[in-house]
Amino acid sequence: MTGDHRTNFPPHDNPLHDSKDVPQFAPNFSVYVLPPDAVCLYSEDRKFFLHGELYCALASAIGEGGRSFRQLVRELGRDFPSDKIHEALKRLLDRRYVVAESPSSAGAAAAYWASLGLPLETAEANLRNCRVRIRSIDVEGGAGLGAALAALGVRVVKRSPDLTVTLVSDYLEARVAALNRKHLADQTPWLLVQPSGIFPLVGPLFSPGNTACWTCLSDRMMRNREVKGLLDRVPARAVAVSPLACNTFGQSAIQLAAVEIAKAIATDFRTDLRDHIISLDLLGSTIAKHYVAARPQCPSCGREELRDPGRKPAPIELGPGAKLVMTSGGYRTVSSRATVARFRKHVSPLTGVVSRLERIDADLPLNTNFHATHNFSGPARTVNELRANL
């Protein structure tokens, strides 16, 4: 079996193998019978083998289609014990190798949900119960995204949404701050998408009281985009604007956004989009995730007692702890490797507390030390300050 990328969902409870429902193999699998006694269930990310003549007979009968669970038991009962047939069918159902046939189970979307380990009926119910409105701020792509979402089963509406998807040309667009305040006041979830440019972005989900807000995100992004931060702080006047600033290049960004949003809704927002930005690099053809942390001291959504930047600092309390003998000649309570593993999600050129982390090459192979390549200087107010900081 290859790596499993599924979300964990509970197994089936209904004993379908005693019903009149017609079984079919899960739509994410192509199924091969290897005589005399092996069956291969093949997908791009998972491969399974079933062994035994009973599984070969079941696979052939299910693959032909049209027979109910009850009919399968009756027909195969001529050659195999009834209890063994029931046991094999139960195993196929519990592992979701086999599902009950439905009109919508033959499509590519059904195969995708099955690849996630998500029952089709659950995905369809979640998609049906979440109304999505598309809103654009000076950027194209709204109509295309709406059509792509609808094709995946998302319920796109013009009013009374359960989720608002806002398209922008820049995540640091000043008008987004007002939208953030409104959603925080209304306690309504929303999501950002930047379909334009050569580095399109999707997410994260902003769910007031549950996740980070846009102010949390903008604080991190501004510190990682020093030049853009300067342009926003000083009276800079745009005399020419790149066509890529407000226009999509191809359909990659729109389709990525549609799939990620539909996946989040179908799984009841149990995906990385809940607390990550998904970025697409159209130059290097790579996709990356960037963690978005909820800041306890955020002036918009943080804890009331921590919002005042002039508050009295809490004293640091030192206490006894175990120490590790290190080959570097010093002592630590936690190894460098363990520290990096714990805080790796906070390393990002987009949203990280540290933009990049690199391992220090050393002659001693047991040394595992790292250094941060990050600009920790304060926000520049002039071009000269920016040059000095960089």
Please state what every model-predicted region is.
Residues 2-49, 170-173:
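Conserved, charge-rich beta-strand/loop surface module that forms ligand/interface-binding patches
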Residues 3, 43-156, 181, 192, ...:
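Long, charge-rich, low-complexity alpha-helical segments
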Residues 3-4, 10-21, 44, 54-55, ...:
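Helix-coil modules at protein/domain termini and other flexible surface or pore-lining loops
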Residues 28, 34, 44, 101, ...:
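Structured loops at beta-to-helix junctions and adjacent beta-edge loops in soluble globular domains
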Residues 30-33, 157, 362-363:
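Short secondary-structure boundary/capping segments within folded domains
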Residues 68, 157-160, 382, 389:
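Alpha-helix N-cap recognition
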Residues 139, 145-152, 160-255, 263-269, ...:
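E1/E1-like adenylate-forming module used to activate ubiquitin-like modifiers
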